[in-house]
């Protein structure tokens, strides 16, 4: 299926590009998330009319994400979990836990924005995770896990 991208999509393209994607990806993700529209002749014509407005909205989102990124850069989040004597946690710290901790500190971060390529954190100490506020704005945050001995 051919779609027009309404915003920048990682590993796919930028705003306004017409790309060919699998039907399921378009129907189940891109179109419901309002990241793309079907590339019909009417939709292409309508997009060209609204292009400047969409580019302005995309620039505003990028500026807001960059401003939030500047505030969030260098932040340290402290999370306490029950742990054993050797420093291993009973359970783990996931991206949802980190998003909740950042939200408590006053940063609007969703769990999908927290990138943990090595998986959940299972050991006490300092860890660095990436937070993708925008496709172009990815910052690093230090997570300090403090063990509560059971």
Curated annotation (Swiss-Prot):
Coiled coil: none annotated. One of its GO terms (biological process) is translation. Keywords: Ribonucleoprotein, Ribosomal protein, RNA-binding, rRNA-binding. Pfam families: Ribosomal_L9_C (PF03948), Ribosomal_L9_N (PF01281). GO terms for cellular component: ribonucleoprotein complex; ribosome. It comes from the Bacteria. The keyword Phosphoprotein does not apply. One of its GO terms (molecular function) is structural constituent of ribosome. Binds to the 23S rRNA. Belongs to the bacterial ribosomal protein bL9 family. This is Large ribosomal subunit protein bL9.
